[in-house]
Amino acid sequence: MMNVKVKVYNGVKYDANSTKVAEVEYNNIKGYEVVTGERATEIGLETDENSRDEYNEYLIITLEDGETSTFCNSHVDMFRI
């Protein structure tokens, strides 16, 4: 198990003009993965058009209870704390 902090940006983190708008901490997560390719496309199709990642990459955090939190990876940074 590990603790992580997720910083959320107002746009694509690869753009120097993006700024942090939120910060969330998760304690005792089971794991995480960054999903790209076909699986990321499937995730994008399950969300509304405004929630899709421009770079087709998603961060999935598996919580202690088995639930998951999914983020547009190009809009967040995750740090182990």
What label would you give each PLM region?
Residues 8-10, 63, 80:
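Residue-level signal for short segments within beta-strands and strand-turn junctions
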Residues 16-78:
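Acidic, low-complexity, intrinsically disordered interaction modules
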Residues 2-13:
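A short beta-strand micro-motif
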Residues 1-2, 80-81:
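Short intrinsically disordered terminal tails
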